[in-house]
Each structure stands twice: as C-alpha cells, then as structure tokens.
C-alpha cells in the first residue's frame, strides 16, 4: 500500500521526511515529493506549497503519478471553536470552502458547481484515528477534536472574516488554506482521505504572532499523530 501525505510548508513535512530511513526527492511543477518509508509504510510525502491551487496541483500530480491508496493531510490550522488551544489536534470529518459563493445559481454557500457542498473524510480512517488519539492524548494537556474544517485562500484573523465564516458554517472547528482542495481532488480520484491538523493559532488578531511562534509545535503534533496512525494501517 502506498500512502500519500501532504503538507503545505517545509515545517509541516520536515519531521515526517526526517523519519524516512532513505529518501528519493522528485520535483514536478514546483511540487516537492519525497518517496520513502514512514513507520514501516511506503509513503509519498508532498510539500505542496501554500493555498488551494498549489494543494490541488500537488494532489493531482500525486494521484496521477504515484497512485496512493490513501491520502492524509498534515499541518497547522487556526482554531475557531471554543475550548481549542494551541497544540490541540483537529481531525476533520467534513470539509468545505469558505470563500466560494455561487448561491445565485442555487448552490449552497461554499459549494463549487457540480461538486458536493461538503467533502467527507474516510469513515474507517476517522474511526482508527478516534481510537488511537483517545489513548494518545489521555495523559496530555492537549486533546483531539473532530468536526468541520473550512478552507479559505486567506489567513483568517479579522473579526469580519470570523463573522462570514460563522454565518455560513456555525459548527466550524478550524480554518486553514489547503484541506478542502486536497479533499476535492481525492474525491474526484476516488481516493480515501483524512485531514489531521494541529492548532497553531486561534484565528484572531494575535494569530500572526501565534502562528510564527507555534508553527513548529503544531507541525510536530500533527506529524506525530500521523505516524501513530500509520502504525495501524
């Protein structure tokens, strides 16, 4: 089984890359692929670049060239739900775009025409993750939560951005900039996927400071959770 793992930034894939005993690096159209083993599993690790287009391009190349049987997205996110703290992990059961609006033609806000309004994470992988992380976080000050992640081509920190997202997605747990695009490509290629992100900031006016300070912690939390999951796949 080949497992595809995608992170947007070098910081988000570094720990996983460094855990590979040997690595083959392949660059296609600016997307950096690292082929090797993680936790004894054959892995294609992608550093896609930031944003929806980079994520979709890289995921499409991965699906076409490397034929992964599962795709997992790692990285950081901004927490939107009450009670979330930096270092907590969000496992997404649903994903949506927060900056797509063709409601004039009868579509749901966030829905790309002829695509689902929400992309569903793989139920089997979600169940595995839930079982593993309940035990993993039992002795930790952090926690794993499950729910809706909303993707925007913007770094979310302003009150007006919050208001728009909460108006259309009142149950949103976290926001970030790639996951729904990855999910859409996985959906179109019929590849099971799972989104695992760690909270680097609380998507507020202190978000830029928090992100810069805690991106490495968030990347470590997310990558460590993925390694634990790989042991069970």
Curated annotation (Swiss-Prot):
Gene3D superfamilies, per the entry: Nucleoside phosphorylase domain (3.40.50.1580)
Gene Ontology molecular function: adenosylhomocysteine nucleosidase activity; methylthioadenosine nucleosidase activity
Gene Ontology process terms (BP): L-methionine salvage from methylthioadenosine; L-methionine salvage from S-adenosylmethionine; nucleoside catabolic process
Pathway(s) annotated for this protein in UniProt: Amino-acid biosynthesis; L-methionine biosynthesis via salvage pathway; S-methyl-5-thio-alpha-D-ribose 1-phosphate from S-methyl-5'-thioadenosine (hydrolase route): step 1/2
Superkingdom field: Bacteria
InterPro entries assigned: MTA_SAH_Nsdase (IPR010049), Nucleoside_phosphorylase_d (IPR000845), Nucleoside_phosphorylase_sf (IPR035994)
Keywords, ordered alphabetically: Amino-acid biosynthesis, Hydrolase, Methionine biosynthesis
Catalytic site positions: 12 (proton acceptor), 201 (proton donor)
Enzyme Commission no: 3.2.2.9
Annotated catalysed reactions: S-adenosyl-L-homocysteine + H2O = S-(5-deoxy-D-ribos-5-yl)-L-homocysteine + adenine; S-methyl-5'-thioadenosine + H2O = 5-(methylsulfanyl)-D-ribose + adenine; 5'-deoxyadenosine + H2O = 5-deoxy-D-ribose + adenine
Role of this protein: Catalyzes the irreversible cleavage of the glycosidic bond in both 5'-methylthioadenosine (MTA) and S-adenosylhomocysteine (SAH/AdoHcy) to adenine and the corresponding thioribose, 5'-methylthioribose and S-ribosylhomocysteine, respectively. Also cleaves 5'-deoxyadenosine, a toxic by-product of radical S-adenosylmethionine (SAM) enzymes, into 5-deoxyribose and adenine.
UniProt cross-references to PANTHER family, sorted A to Z: 5'-METHYLTHIOADENOSINE/S-ADENOSYLHOMOCYSTEINE NUCLEOSIDASE, 5'-METHYLTHIOADENOSINE_S-ADENOSYLHOMOCYSTEINE NUCLEOSIDASE
Stored NCBIfam families: MTA_SAH-Nsdase (TIGR01704), PRK05584.1 (NF004079)
HAMAP family, per the entry: Salvage_MtnN (MF_01684)
Family to which the UniProt record says this protein belongs: Belongs to the PNP/UDP phosphorylase family. MtnN subfamily.
Protein name per its UniProtKB record: 5'-methylthioadenosine/S-adenosylhomocysteine nucleosidase
